[in-house]
From Swiss-Prot:
The keyword Transport does not apply. Disulfide bonds: none annotated. InterPro entries: 3-IsopropMal_deHydase_ssu (IPR004431), Aconitase/3IPM_dehydase_swvl (IPR015928), AconitaseA/IPMdHydase_ssu_swvl (IPR000573), IPMI_Swivel (IPR033940), LeuD (IPR050075). Catalyzes the isomerization between 2-isopropylmalate and 3-isopropylmalate, via the formation of 2-isopropylmaleate. One of its GO terms (molecular function) is 3-isopropylmalate dehydratase activity. It comes from Micrococcus luteus (strain ATCC 4698 / DSM 20030 / JCM 1464 / CCM 169 / CCUG 5858 / IAM 1056 / NBRC 3333 / NCIMB 9278 / NCTC 2665 / VKM Ac-2230) (Micrococcus lysodeikticus). Pathway: Amino-acid biosynthesis; L-leucine biosynthesis; L-leucine from 3-methyl-2-oxobutanoate: step 2/4. This is 3-isopropylmalate dehydratase small subunit. Belongs to the LeuD family. LeuD type 1 subfamily. It catalyses: (2R,3S)-3-isopropylmalate = (2S)-2-isopropylmalate. GO terms for cellular component: 3-isopropylmalate dehydratase complex. Its EC number is 4.2.1.33.
Length: 201
């Protein structure tokens, strides 16, 4: 997973609350078996409207989504995070996230920055008054900056560490290789053991 320290990109003001995962990516797109190529599925229903924010310049090239409260509710869909990332988003700012979406985001390297509602309102105004304004998400200092607005955001320490170091679940597990080896070495012989990975050929 790619490390995340800070990112600056065009902010996209999405004035919508309770955006669920079916709105982020409709269920019809979940039949695909790959983990990439979902950019066309992101907000597919809403993008039928030519006036939808992502259909207008300069927001179509945005990389920081600024949404309303309760973003990512509904069913657990890693596809929702994949679609956001495939489109080009590196971070989502919201006053509150669904727990499952926040967890899926952390595992895929998408920063879910929880910012107070009043600060989100101020960021929206900056982006709407000056389209093309950039937003900086600084994971080191846990702050977001947009025009004259600088605001702190909440993110738990473990998620922050994993994002900063680029650690997915497998990488975290491999970080305990010595302990795993010691545990396996002490297991009684009659119990199942982990076999070495097979190689082709």
């Amino acid at each position: 997973m790619e490390k995340f320290t800070t990112h600056t990109g065009v902010g996209v003001p999405l004035r919508a609350s309770n955006v669920d995962t079916d709105q982020i990516i409709p269920a019809v797109y979940l039949k695909r078996i790959s983990r990439t190529g979902f950019e066309d599925a992101l907000f597919a229903g809403w993008r039928q409207d030519p006036d939808f924010i992502l259909n207008t310049e300069p927001f179509s090239g945005g990389t920081v989504l600024v949404a309303g409260s309760d973003f990512g509710t509904g069913s657990s869909r890693e596809h929702a995070v994949w679609a956001l990332k495939d489109y080009g988003f590196r971070a989502v700012i919201s006053p509150r996230f669904a727990d499952i979406f926040r967890g899926n985001s952390a595992k895929q390297g998408l920063v879910a920055a929880q910012v107070e509602q009043e600060d989100v309102e101020r960021i929206w105004k900056e982006l709407e008054n000056r389209p093309g304004t950039t937003v900086t998400v600084d994971l080191v200092t846990r702050t977001v900056e947009c025009g004259d607005v600088t605001a702190p955001f909440q993110i738990d320490d473990d998620t922050r560490r994993r994002l900063l170091e680029g650690l997915d679940d497998i990488a975290v597990t491999l970080g305990h290789q010595a302990e795993i080896d010691a545990y396996e070495a002490d297991r009684p012989a009659y119990k199942p053991t982990t076999l070495p990975a097979r190689t082709a050929g």
